[in-house]
């Protein structure tokens, strides 16, 4: 399963956007809330929409949402239960937003891609539950017809971060201020992106990896590793981060030995993988590391 691919996306991958949304809302007690010029489709439950907010009649808003002053919720936006928009937030569609997401002032989410070959085809953005989008964060939709940008759940995107078209971001990640993803980047679960990190298009960052501030990422960052520098280099395993997530000491030793074989020997990647398989016991972390480095179109950072 791809990192960040939401349950909604997996369940409705064979449907077009409109039918998928209709299927998602089946059986739910939807009503039409007519408040002046606001005729957004809303659940028959209390919510707070500021009088200066502009809500498209084609937006769908679930209960418990709070939409602050001068926010804009556009056509094709589905806003899940309990979402909070501070003020001057812009949500554009087609975009599906899950539950309990927070959008701080001047976040712009769901705008069309900045890819110059985009020709106004219908593309999508899907966001999971419990994410935080701080001030001036931008997230773009996909580029090709039917393409999606996917963001998982429980992520924290600090001020001025950017997620470009067709990216896939997993769960429980932290992007420090001004972290930037170019198009088609994949970020797996539990990644920490240092402030001002810039990631080249089509790169991948493996789970539990971390990048230092101002890092320039032009190839894949293997899982469990720390990358730092311009251009970035692998500095070792993310020992402190892995300990905080409860990794056993034995597993840390195995990952450290795998790092030594990959980065402190004269072996190429294929030879290093063979040696890791021969010398170290099977475990899920090493299997994921091996799969990641052997399926790396751009190659891994050395």
What residues fall within each predicted segment?
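Structural signal for interior beta-strand "rungs" in well-ordered beta-sheet cores
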Residues: 48-228, 232-233
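Terminal amphipathic alpha-helical/low-complexity segments used for targeting or macromolecular assembly
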Residues: 5-8, 17-18, 22-52, 57-58, ...
């Amino acid at each position: 399963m791809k990192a960040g691919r939401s349950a909604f996306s997996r369940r409705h991958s064979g449907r077009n956007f409109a039918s998928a949304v209709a299927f998602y809302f089946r059986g739910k007690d939807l009503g039409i809330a007519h408040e002046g010029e606001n005729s957004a489709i809303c659940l028959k439950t209390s919510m707070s929409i500021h009088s200066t907010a502009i809500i498209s009649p084609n937006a769908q808003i679930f209960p418990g949402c709070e939409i602050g002053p001068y926010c804009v919720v556009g056509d094709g936006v589905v806003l899940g239960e309990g979402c909070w928009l501070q003020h001057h937030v812009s949500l554009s569609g087609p975009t599906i937003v899950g539950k309990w997401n927070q959008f701080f002032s001047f976040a712009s989410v769901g705008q069309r891609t900045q890819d110059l070959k985009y020709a106004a085809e219908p593309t999508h953005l899907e966001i999971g539950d419990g994410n935080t989008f701080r001030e001036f964060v931008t997230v773009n939709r996909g580029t090709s017809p039917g393409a999606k940008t996917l963001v998982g759940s429980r992520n924290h995107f600090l001020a001025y971060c950017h997620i470009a078209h067709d990216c896939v971001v997993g769960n429980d990640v932290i992007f420090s201020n001004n972290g930037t993803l170019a198009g088609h980047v994949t970020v797996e679960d539990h990644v920490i992106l240092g402030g001002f990190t810039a990631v080249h298009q089509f790169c991948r960052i493996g789970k539990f990896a971390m990048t230092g501030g101002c890092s320039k990422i032009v190839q894949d960052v293997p899982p469990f590793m720390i990358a730092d520098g311009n251009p970035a280099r692998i500095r070792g395993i993310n020992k402190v981060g892995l300990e905080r997530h409860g990794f056993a000491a034995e597993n840390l030793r195995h990952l450290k030995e795998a790092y030594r074989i990959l980065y402190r020997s004269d072996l190429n990647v294929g030879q290093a993988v063979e040696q890791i398989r021969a010398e170290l016991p099977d475990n899920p972390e090493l299997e994921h590391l091996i799969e990641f480095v052997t399926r790396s179109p751009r190659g891994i950072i050395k």
